[in-house]
């Protein structure tokens, strides 16, 4: 059923922050199978649809956390079937926007949980879903707000699986247990414009900005840690608002981003960056403005018993030993980690957000097997059959 669920989910054009029927479809499906569900819409100007659904009323509560929203699909004519929101099956693969990020993992956990409930009437614990239509965007009224809401209602999650596409070369090779932080900067160096033939009557901000960027981009922030790669600064935009060749610009503006590990905080990095900027601007007798915003702090979890148990299930099911990682961008795991231990585990990440995003059907089966086996091992099923996928 996971392929059917995935094809149905691809059919909803759920561009951030719209559900466009995707969450409503899942809500109806889960209610049909005995889940207690609640759909909440948060936000005023951009309304975000969220779902919490739970089956059972005892501990432990194993929760799948995910998002139905997708990024724009680009030119539809570049897709195999010219319609990225109609699932296309070809040569053992399913194509469509959101296939790996992350409707495929939602489909797999849907199938695994419904099959588990059907096959096991004596389990101890609860299975739940927390889904949102805004993870790819601002993420203000999605998982973060829904977690606050359900905890205020008395719900508690004991362990979460975030279904982001984490695997690199094959299903099972990577489990994410943390994420890097992210901080964005906007620097405007303010000079005095003028004619290029009379530089003595102007103060060009560009030489100063070049020296600032040269120092910033050559800083070795750290050497990384056991689970984190080294922190990294990338320049993303430079603008002087000047297309004329004989005019010295008045202002030079640059945007840059730092992805940082747990050796830093947004505050310490901002202080370090501003010290460098201040020194150069004072030397060149220039003013500046600096704006920065951190969308996520870095975090890392110590692999506790439940995280290690999940890794063991992956290894037993797929005969591959997963590595713990913190690579990649930010995700809603940064909100979930404030409430419970978690793993991020899903499909391959290599086609996420790309034209002709796809997954192998065999990879869906592998992911389904891992999810199903984890439920079997965690929810105290007595007299259970051998784990799926094992030989």
Swiss-Prot record:
GO BP terms in the entry: diaminopimelate biosynthetic process; L-arginine biosynthetic process; lysine biosynthetic process via diaminopimelate
Pathway: Amino-acid biosynthesis; L-lysine biosynthesis via DAP pathway; LL-2,6-diaminopimelate from (S)-tetrahydrodipicolinate (succinylase route): step 3/3
Superkingdom field: Bacteria
PROSITE patterns assigned: ARGE_DAPE_CPG2_2
Reactions catalysed, as given in the entry: N-succinyl-(2S,6S)-2,6-diaminopimelate + H2O = (2S,6S)-2,6-diaminopimelate + succinate
Location of the active site: 69, 135
Residues annotated to bind Zn(2+) 1: 67, 101, 164
Any one GO molecular function term: succinyl-diaminopimelate desuccinylase activity
Listed EC numbers: 3.5.1.18
InterPro entries cross-referenced by the UniProt entry: ArgE/DapE_CS (IPR001261), Bact_exopeptidase_dim_dom (IPR036264), DapE_proteobac (IPR005941), Peptidase_M20 (IPR002933), Peptidase_M20_dimer (IPR011650), Peptidase_M20A (IPR050072)
Any single Pfam family the record assigns to this protein: M20_dimer
Record-linked Gene3D superfamilies: 3.30.70.360, Zn peptidases
Main enzyme class: hydrolase
PANTHER family per record: ACETYLORNITHINE DEACETYLASE, N-ACETYL-L-CITRULLINE DEACETYLASE
Function, as annotated: Catalyzes the hydrolysis of N-succinyl-L,L-diaminopimelic acid (SDAP), forming succinate and LL-2,6-diaminopimelate (DAP), an intermediate involved in the bacterial biosynthesis of lysine and meso-diaminopimelic acid, an essential component of bacterial cell walls.
Family: Belongs to the peptidase M20A family. DapE subfamily.
Name used for this protein in its record: Succinyl-diaminopimelate desuccinylase
Organismal lineage: Bacteria, Pseudomonadati, Pseudomonadota, Alphaproteobacteria, Rickettsiales
Gene name in the database record: dapE
């Amino acid at each position: 059923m996971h392929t059917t669920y995935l094809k149905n989910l691809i059919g909803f054009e759920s561009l951030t922050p719209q559900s466009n029927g995707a969450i409503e479809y899942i809500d109806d499906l889960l209610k049909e199978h005995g889940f207690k569900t609640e759909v909440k819409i948060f936000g005023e100007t951009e309304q975000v649809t969220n779902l919490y659904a739970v089956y059972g009323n005892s501990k432990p509560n194993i929760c799948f956390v995910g998002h139905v929203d997708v990024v724009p699909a680009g030119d539809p004519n570049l897709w195999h079937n010219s319609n990225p929101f109609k699932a296309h099956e070809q040569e053992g693969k399913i194509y469509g926007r959101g296939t790996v990020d992350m409707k495929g993992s939602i489909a797999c956990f849907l199938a695994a949980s419904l099959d588990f409930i059907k096959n096991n009437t004596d389990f101890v614990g609860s299975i739940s879903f927390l889904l949102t239509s805004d993870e790819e965007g601002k993420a203000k009224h999605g998982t973060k707000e829904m977690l606050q809401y359900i905890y205020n209602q008395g719900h508690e999650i004991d362990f979460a699986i975030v279904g982001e596409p984490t695997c690199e070369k094959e299903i099972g090779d990577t489990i994410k247990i943390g994420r890097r932080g992210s901080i964005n900067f906007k620097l405007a160096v303010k000079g005095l414009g003028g004619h290029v033939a009379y530089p003595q009557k102007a103060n060009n901000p560009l030489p100063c900005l070049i020296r600032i960027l040269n120092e910033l981009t050559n800083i070795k922030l750290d050497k990384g840690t056991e689970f984190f790669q080294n922190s990294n600064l990338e320049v993303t935009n430079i603008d002087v608002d000047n297309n004329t060749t004989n005019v010295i610009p008045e202002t030079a503006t640059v945007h840059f981003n730092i992805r940082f590990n747990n050796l830093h905080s947004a505050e310490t990095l901002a202080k370090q960056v501003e010290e460098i900027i201040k020194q150069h601007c004072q030397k060149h007798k220039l003013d500046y403005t600096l704006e920065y915003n951190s969308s996520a702090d870095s975090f890392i979890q110590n692999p506790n018993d439940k995280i290690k148990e999940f890794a063991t299930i992956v290894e037993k099911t797929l005969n591959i030993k997963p590595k713990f990682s913190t690579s990649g961008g930010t995700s809603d795991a940064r909100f979930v980690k404030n409430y419970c231990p978690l793993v991020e585990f899903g499909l391959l990440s290599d086609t996420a957000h790309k034209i002709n995003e796809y997954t192998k059907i065999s990879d869906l089966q592998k992911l389904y097997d891992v999810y199903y086996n984890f439920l079997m091992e965690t929810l105290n099923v007595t007299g259970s059959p051998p784990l799926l996928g094992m030989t």
